[in-house]
Amino acid sequence: DIAIRGDRIVGIGTNLGTADRTIDATGLAVSPGFVNMLSWATDSLIADGRSQSDIRQGVTLEVMGEGWSMGPLSDEMKAEAPGQQGDIKYDVTWTTLGEYLQFLEDKGISTNVASFIGATTVRIHELGYADRAPSTEELERMQELVRAAMEEGALGVGSSLIYAPAFYADTNELIALSRVAAEYGGRYISHIRSEGGQFVEAVDELITIAREAGIGAEIYHLKAAGADNFDKLE
């Protein structure tokens, strides 16, 4: 038997006493809610906060921010937003990542939500889609965007280095952003730069970022693509 008070498990075992409500789970499995570590429910939760496709599979936490996050947004990014939307259309009424998360909470959603700040989002905010390194001043502004997001509750910095314009960022840029997240106990999480011929080098880059920034790091969907690269996972 499992005893629950409010939103906490307070007892597991037999003879736990009586309760105001009893659920007969005979023949069923009882587990904590599942975490969707790479969620793209950013738009669908706006359309339908019930999150039926995930909540009915036991998902209770949507973690967003694989390289791209719903904030911070510049005026130019807001202007581009309608043309980048798919079947789900909506007005962008927020600017920062924290404001987006608050928007979802105020709207009402079934799942819990959390987000990394996207390294791509920060880069576009300051550099647009330019294939170049940021200037000292631009990098400082990018770091301040990360700082603001961390203070709003971001989990850390997320990157997706296999896509443009994300792969325009070099290792030093990612270290600089991650150092700010590290100050708040955040993490660096990445869709690494290569899952094929440069797989080992891509993993080495993530380790370098973690060491230089003093931050914990994780890899999204760790895999090696192509039979010639399978042994690299060893």
Language model regions located:
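Generic beta-strand/beta-sheet core signal
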Residues: 5, 12, 64-65, 116, ...
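Histidine-rich, glycine-flanked metal-binding segment
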Residues: 1-33, 48
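Divalent-metal coordination cores built from histidine and acidic residues
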Residues: 28, 47-155
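Histidine/acidic residue-rich metal-binding segments in metalloenzymes
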Residues: 133-159, 165-234
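A structural micro-motif
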Residues: 20, 28, 111, 186, ...
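Metallo-beta-lactamase
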Residues: 33-42
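Residue-level detector of flexible, active-site-proximal loop/helix-junction positions
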Residues: 16, 29, 120, 224-226
